């Protein structure tokens, strides 16, 4: 199979056009202009609100003018991540894709199918002339990945439909009817630097090759967190060396909503201890590889000497390492409802650590399907960093989306799926934030579902789209549109 044979052709044509447009989160200007031009070229009513959300209206197929207006929604931004050795500028370069069996992938970068494929499906519907449907509003929100900015800023009344299909889910055959709320915690350790004592040897230690992934949807897949592993080594080694280890820098992770997949630390030890530290690192690497022998089979541990540099003051460095060692990470509780007892309810992910000249900045992300538990988890993380002397702030929270009892749209979506594929879809919640949570606050009467084609390893350079599921989602969506129209 080559790219010219991908089906539905109209959807993949639109996806290819989208991937020519740089669209990092918070930098969606080119995508907004593309969507405006698209709507105007097709003579469709096109609106852009103050936040940068785009809405394109398409009138009903003749004979279905009195049908319920249905909203199709996706987000226009993408997570930008690449392999360390790949030369790529997400603000200028087009995503380069290729077919690998039944999967569409990108060459060394994130693919942008989250949520570019949702946008492509909407554009294909807007461009098509042979689909039966009632009135449609296609909505494209901005900056979903780094703050849900578009959904936060959307005012009541921008959308007018009473049913909404969110096209930002990642497992075909699953219809999502609820999602987790979330919040981020930001901790900063301020420090002064000093010269290391005489007789110290400087070492650089790195870890890469982890799977990473989405910190909500992938948090229960027993994937390693690069930050927690590197902090664990620092804590262990400092204990072995009677507190003599001196830290220079700690850098790992890029996005608040991704499990960090690589990282690097620079530190100094006494000359007399350097060979023991190398031996300890090798033993530690072997132990960690064994712990994750199923889920992380490409871990790469490296240690080398490096140039001397001013070290972080001892008291702050030790408290920073202890805080990272102590802070909760991973899935913490599962849902109490028997029907979804397998699903993660509450989790936390230490997402990024960045060292500047005089401070270390940490971002951790908390999620829960129960808002009171979200608050408690956020306070737990906050307390760990406060105890260590950090300056802590908490970001805006976004709400959970609760399952709607007797949802007409859910019923229509399930029946359409059964009609097409002869089996029931799985109706479930997701342990990740969807814009549906915010929509449910602004539009409390809005009936919503979320589904999409199968994606794997989102938010990483290994992101992949399962090609056959795009046509399945396309057929499913068209059947729902016909059902609503009739």
Language-model features: where?
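Active-site metal-coordination/substrate-binding segment of hydrolases
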Residues: 64-146, 151-162, 202, 317, ...
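Midchain, well-structured core segments that form catalytic/ion-binding scaffolds
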Residues: 102-105, 145-146, 156-367
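Acidic/His- and Gly-rich active-site-bordering loop/insert found
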Residues: 2-102
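Substrate-recognition/cap regions that form aromatic- and gly/pro-loop-enriched pockets
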Residues: 343-432
């Amino acid at each position: 199979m080559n790219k010219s044979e991908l089906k539905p052709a109209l959807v993949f044509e639109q996806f290819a056009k989208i991937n020519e447009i740089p669209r990092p989160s918070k930098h969606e200007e080119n995508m907004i202009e593309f969507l405006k031009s698209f709507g105007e070229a097709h003579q469709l009513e096109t609106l852009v609100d103050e936040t940068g959300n785009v809405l394109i209206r398409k009138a009903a197929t003749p004979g279905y003018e009195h049908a319920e207006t249905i909203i199709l929604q996706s987000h226009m931004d993408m997570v930008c991540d690449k392999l360390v050795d790949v030369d790529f500028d997400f603000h200028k370069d087009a995503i380069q894709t290729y077919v690998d069996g039944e999967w569409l992938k990108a060459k060394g970068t994130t693919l942008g199918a989250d949520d570019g494929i949702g946008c492509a499906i909407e554009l294909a519907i807007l461009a098509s002339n042979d689909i039966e449907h009632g009135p449609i509003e296609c909505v494209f929100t901005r900056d979903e990945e780094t703050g849900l900015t578009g959904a936060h800023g959307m005012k009541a009344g921008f959308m007018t439909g009473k049913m909404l299909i969110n096209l930002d889910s990642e497992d075909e055959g699953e219809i999502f009817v609820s999602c987790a709320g979330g919040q981020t915690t930001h901790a900063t350790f301020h420090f002064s630097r000093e010269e290391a004592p005489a007789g110290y040897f400087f070492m650089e230690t790195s870890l890469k090759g982890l799977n990473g992934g989405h910190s909500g949807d992938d948090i229960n897949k027993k994937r390693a967190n690069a930050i927690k592993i590197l902090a664990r080594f620092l804590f262990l080694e400092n204990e072995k060396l009677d507190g003599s280890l001196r830290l220079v820098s700690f850098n790992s992770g890029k996005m608040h909503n991704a499990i960090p997949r690589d990282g690097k630390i620079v530190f100094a030890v006494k000359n007399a201890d350097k060979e023991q530290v190398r031996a300890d690192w090798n033993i530690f690497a072997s132990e960690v590889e064994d712990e994750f022998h199923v889920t992380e089979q490409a871990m790469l541990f490296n240690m080398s000497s490096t140039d001397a540099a001013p070290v972080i003051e001892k008291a702050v460095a030790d408290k920073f390492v202890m805080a990272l060692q102590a802070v909760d990470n991973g899935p913490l509780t599962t849902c109490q409802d028997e029907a979804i007892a397998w699903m993660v309810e509450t989790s936390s992910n230490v997402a990024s650590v960045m060292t500047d000249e005089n401070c270390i900045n940490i971002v951790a992300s908390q999620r829960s399907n129960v808002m009171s538990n979200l608050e408690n988890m956020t306070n737990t993380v906050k307390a760990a960093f406060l105890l260590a002397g950090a300056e802590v702030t908490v970001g805006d929270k976004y709400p959970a989306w609760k399952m709607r009892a007797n949802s007409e749209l859910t019923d229509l979506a399930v029946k359409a799926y059964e009609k097409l594929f002869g089996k029931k879809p799985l109706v479930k919640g997701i342990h990740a934030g969807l814009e549906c949570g915010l929509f449910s606050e602004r539009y409390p009467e809005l009936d919503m579902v979320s589904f999409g084609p199968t994606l794997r390893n989102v938010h990483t350079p290994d992101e992949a789209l399962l090609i056959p599921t795009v046509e399945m989602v396309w057929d499913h969506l068209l059947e729902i549109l016909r059902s609503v129209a009739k």
